[in-house]
Design a protein with these regions (language model features):
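N-terminal mature ectodomain segment of secretory-pathway/periplasmic proteins
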Residues: 27-30, 34-86
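Sec-dependent N-terminal signal peptides
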Residues: 5-17
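Short hydrophobic/aromatic-rich beta-strand segments that constitute the beta-sheet cores
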Residues: 43-45, 70-74, 89-92, 143, ...
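Flexible, surface-exposed loop/linker segments and immediately adjacent secondary-structure boundaries
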Residues: 97-139
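Short, Lys/Arg-enriched N-terminal segments with co-localized hydrophobic residues
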Residues: 1-3
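Gly/Pro-enriched, hydrophobic low-complexity segments
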Residues: 122-128, 133-207
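An acidic-aromatic
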Residues: 61-111, 177-178
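Sec/Tat signal peptide C-region and signal peptidase I cleavage site
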Residues: 19-24
Length: 207
């Protein structure tokens, strides 16, 4: 079940205050600069996962900060919360009544969530920008991890009308995952928004 952690690390149509320069000129040389002043992310999303001809759709919310912290809430049918305090990964499964706690090791940096939790200099060391092309009024940028042992194979960022509206990726599990964002904001939020409330009946398991 811990592969679920990788499925979500995925993540992440962003806010109102977007620099028009990037809307018009986004390309391989300035893609990561687009995120330079965007320290916070809040959004709702629809996630579609395609594997072996079967597609599953789930909705959720995400909040992330570039100091490594994040919180993702999946609604029905998953009913899970996955988050990080920058040191550990927490996965709360309401159905199992269990929260797993794992160390946030370096290999988590090579997952899609790092687009929103790593600083821009780290993004340049983690990923190689393969292309940024205009496709039907959408700028599609493809990036690949520099690490040979990353579970992520390819990641695509889609920009339209000055905003990043979709993130998709393929991974070593044979999945294609697409996150479509809406009600996205780059504005800051209190640290309390990243806290995970643990019901009394939940068992905590450390790994």
């Amino acid at each position: 079940r811990f592969t679920m952690i990788y499925k979500f690390l995925v993540i992440s149509c962003f806010a109102a205050s977007v620099n028009l320069f990037f809307a018009e000129e986004i390309n391989k040389s300035n893609l990561f600069d687009y995120f330079d002043d965007k320290k916070y992310l809040s959004a709702e999303f629809t996630q579609r996962t395609l594997q072996d001809g079967y597609e599953r759709t789930v909705k959720g919310t995400i909040k992330a900060v570039r100091d490594g912290k994040f919180k993702i809430i999946y609604f029905e049918p998953m009913q899970e919360v996955i988050g990080s305090d920058g040191k550990s990964i927490f996965r709360l499964d309401y159905e199992l009544e269990q929260m797993d706690v794992l160390p946030q090791e370096d290999y988590f940096k090579n997952t899609p969530i790092s687009i929103f939790t790593s600083d821009v200099s780290s993004l340049s060391s983690l990923y190689q920008i393969s292309s940024c092309d205009m496709v039907e009024n959408t700028t599609v940028c493809e990036i690949t991890p520099k690490s040979n042992d990353a579970f992520l194979e390819k990641l695509f960022l889609n920009f339209r009308n000055f905003e990043l509206e979709e993130l998709s990726y393929t991974d070593s599990f044979g999945q294609t995952v697409t996150l479509s964002f809406y009600n996205l904001s780059w504005l800051s939020f209190p640290n309390e928004d990243l806290e995970i409330s643990i019901p009394k009946e939940i068992d905590i398991v450390y790994h």
